[in-house]
Amino acid sequence: VWLSALKFIGKHLAKHQLSKLGR
């Protein structure tokens, strides 16, 4: 479960970071 949660969070954070860099 933890791995799944970390993966999900990591994806979310990565998207946010990309969005920030994109702007």
UniProtKB/Swiss-Prot annotation:
Subcellular location: Secreted; Target cell membrane
GO cellular component annotations of the record: extracellular region; membrane; other organism cell membrane
One biological process term in Gene Ontology: defense response to bacterium
Primary residence: secreted
Superkingdom of the organism of origin: Eukaryota
Tissue: Expressed by the venom gland.
Record's function text: Has strong antibacterial activity and biofilm inhibition effects against Gram-positive and -negative bacteria including E.coli, S.epidermidis, and A.baumannii and oxacillin-resistant S.aureus and meropenem-resistant P.aeruginosa. Is not cytotoxic against human foreskin fibroblast Hs27 or hemolytic against mammalian red blood cells. Its mechanism of action involves binding to lipoteichoic acid and lipopolysaccharide of Gram-positive and Gram-negative bacterial membranes, respectively, to destroy the bacterial membrane.
Name of protein: Lycosin-II
Organism of this sequence: Lycosa singoriensis
